[in-house]
Amino acid sequence: MIVKPENMTFADKKIRMLIAGFPGIGKTTLALSAPKPLYIDVDLSAERINRDVLNMAEGITQPRDYDELRRDLGIGANDMELQAVKSSLKDFETIVIDTGGKLLTIMGQYGRKNNPKYGQTDGSLSLKGYGWLGKEFQRFLDHCIYELDKHIVIIFHTVEEKDGDDTKLRIKAEGSSRNNVWEVMDLGGFMEMRGNTRTIGFSNCERYFAKGTRGVHGVMPIPELVPGVKNDFLTRLFEQYNAVSAEEAKRAAEDKAKYDAAMEKAKQIIDGLTDADSVNAATAEFKAIDHALTSKKESGNLWNAKTAELGLIYDKVLGKYTPKEKEAE
């Protein structure tokens, strides 16, 4: 359905977020601070996670391969099966994937199994396989967002890479697929310790990639979890993100209404112009119009076109419009 831009609020947008960092930094704990998370343990590493952290999840699943994950989430299901999946997931608001690197690996295995052209003899993906993997990752996110109506948070481990004398930090993922991951994310944060404080950075720097939008940027401290304090950092961040979106939409609607009023007023004035006297009489009122967006430029173009049509020019010496002198024949 086509809608006007000013009517798009994005106030309840489902957010796609990437969390990157070294093992042990607390990525899973942070991811489970999202609203009502379903923890999808693709790494099969839940037994290594502190029980108190696991208890933060509303539910846990450990798919052994991408086929099982597709069934769990209703990917490729018929309408009846998809409705059953949606019903089973109704109590969850966020899908947490741990880890994204392993998700891409089992996706690649699924692709090679179903189409030998996607694989090479050494077991790695072919060029065509990587192309499919990027599209499948996008389809996976779209399904979680648009079909299941969930936020999605994907955890990635980090690896160090040498770039000349510098050491860069990059997400750990199979081949070129890691470059496609960032494109589809709304937020991407890199976790690290600064002194004794855990932080997450949402702005690119010389050491790592990150992504911030809707007022989410820079480095944020992550509160230390203590008894009695709720683990809700991402819940509050998502609320802030959508609140900014709602405020932007509100301002856009107000600006559009102001623009429409300005253009209507300008056209009303211009339609009444017939000669130099009427133009000069209307100039002050025209200049007093309260503009928004591009109304000043657009109405100015209409004014200039009308005065040219009437054969008028602005005389800077006299400070008013006068008939243009006819050229001698």
Predicted regions and their residues:
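Interfaces that engage single-stranded nucleic acids at replication/repair/recombination sites
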Residues: 9-18, 25, 33-34, 44, ...
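Phosphate-binding/switch region of NTP-binding enzymes
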Residues: 22, 146-223
